[in-house]
Amino acid sequence: MNSTWKQYITILKNVVKPALGCTEPICAAYATSVATQMLGEKAETIDVFVSDNLYKNSMGVFVPRTGRVGLAIAAAAGATGGNPEAGLEVLAKLTQSQVNEAQQLIDAGRVQVKRETTDEFIYCRVVVKGSQHHAEVTISGGHTLIVEKRLDDNVIFSLDSSLPKASTASICDGVDITISSIYDFATHAEFDDIKFILKAKDLNIALAQEGLKNPYGLEVGRTYQKNIDTGLLSKSLDSDILIYTSAASDARMGGANLPAMSNYGSGNQGIAATIPVVKMADFYNADEETLARAFIMSHLGAIYIKSHYPPLSAFCGNAVTSAAAAMAMVYLAGGSFEQSCSAIQNTISDTSGMICDGAKSTCAMKVGSSAQSAMKSSLLALNNHCVTKQGVIAEDVEKTIKNIGRMITTGMPNIDHEIIEIMAS
């Protein structure tokens, strides 16, 4: 295997991984779990300082195993029952007594959450005080990327600032990667080297099944399934994609105790990169090797596109994640590389106006809409229809990706600010 392909596998293994609960509040839970471990005693007070974007994406989402919403319960639960060794699955073994203990801290006014001015989009600093000591943990640039630890005001760990951060924001820096090279890797790599990606199907389909079995959030997936059962809607590949993607997001945003296989720090985006591809593969009776190759396109393609703009912004990441899913869906249908590129162009054209106004139950609608766009865009591409040189869509897919990155990075910060101020008011 050449060195570039090894880099691709490293990227995938670093960025496509299980996460229990929405990753923004889980970031705070992870930080407090580490700080409490440093203390060696029970937490008595917890102060949480977060970036505007982390604040935005934590306000309306349920925290797994708690039945509650927001940063305060996430941070408190991380301190009372989090396992710092579990990373993004820090709350996987949280007990009800630990949840009760966390709620008692909140009710006593011992957990405070504040926004902090910072240039980082993913940023969380926690100060946890016990009876004898106090510990401070700072995460910056990635949901579990600790850059500093302090115990009783003494720095006991500091990340070397000269080293490149292992965060999603920079993970493609210095890597020779394009849509063409991703396609080449996906179609020619040895199956044994890429079959690890199949775990995405197991986790995200299980999450979808949970969302169909039990009521979570807006019950988008269950509602569509109910209307198919009554005959108002017809069952089809398109409806299956909508139902399963929405149901998985329903469950995730509703605090289901099951992990998602995330993409770029987002469980919903992991769902968007996985489930439409699974459903297309099922339709064509694709074998595991073909599915794995399609997953490489959807997951690595999504990572590559999203590396052109900040990891948290005013733009809904499911939009371009679904563009990469559309690329994979064309491949599964027997389309050409050129048609896969057309699918990306079509999806970005369709979804480029979708904003992010925080992680919450309505994400299930956006995930479903993005997945349906991937289906629509792949069908257009397979019939040789492609959006070109219209709006932000260029003649070439690489230029389109650069355009969308520019639009988000330089054009949307003010929109993001206003969204956050509206939500906080």
From Swiss-Prot:
| Top-rank lineage group of the source organism | Bacteria
Query: What is an example of a Pfam family matching this protein?
Result: SDH_alpha
Instruction: Provide a Gene Ontology MF annotation, just one.
Output: L-cysteine desulfhydrase activity
Record GO biological process: L-cysteine catabolic process to pyruvate
Among InterPro entries, the record links this protein to: Ser_deHydtase-like_asu, UPF0597
Q: So what family is this one in?
A: Belongs to the UPF0597 family.
What is the protein name given in its UniProt record? UPF0597 protein VSAL_I0741
Give the organism, scientific name: Aliivibrio salmonicida (strain LFI1238)
